[in-house]
Amino acid sequence: MVTGIQITKANDSALINSFWLLDEEKSQARCVCAKSGYSEDQIVPMSDLGQIEYREIPLEIKPEVRVEGGQHLNVNVLRRETLEDAVKHPENYPQLTIRVSGYAVRFNSLTPEQQRDVIARTFTASL
């Protein structure tokens, strides 16, 4: 269990009024903030703090959120005819932007092969 503390008395004056997170299981202390001598997030053995007096600080520890895996979906809201016409008449569609692999790209900046590939992947005959 992790305990939050504010050191009120210590032999080392740099520790006074500093805030720490104590992990009893690992016998470690993590500095939250100190005036000098210790940096934020510095981890030291609890024994390095020496003889100290402190007051406990209430902590609200939220469970760690883990997100693994996931899906990615590109959605182009166009008709097939619009893209096919943009291939034939690019001058009529100078601002036509589509999503390709998570990036926004101007359709006319793609090579003809890439344009055909986008049309083939975007529009299928059946699922």
Swiss-Prot record:
Residue ranges occupied by any Glycine radical domain in the UniProt entry: 5-127
Instruction: Report the InterPro entries cross-referenced here.
Output: Auton_GlycylRad_Cofactor, Form_AcTrfase_GR_CS, Gly_radical, Glycyl_radical_cofactor_GrcA
Query: Its GO CC terms?
Result: cytosol
Residue(s) carrying Glycine radical: 102
Pfam families xrefs = Gly_radical
Look up the domain of life of the source: Bacteria
Going by the UniProt record, its keywords in alphabetical order are:
Organic radical
What are the recorded GO MF terms, alphabetically?
formate C-acetyltransferase activity
Q: Which PANTHER family match?
A: FORMATE ACETYLTRANSFERASE, FORMATE ACETYLTRANSFERASE 1
Q: What role is this protein assigned?
A: Acts as a radical domain for damaged PFL and possibly other radical proteins.
Name of the protein this chain belongs to: Autonomous glycyl radical cofactor
Organism per entry: Pectobacterium atrosepticum (strain SCRI 1043 / ATCC BAA-672) (Erwinia carotovora subsp. atroseptica)
Q: What is the primary gene name for this protein?
A: grcA
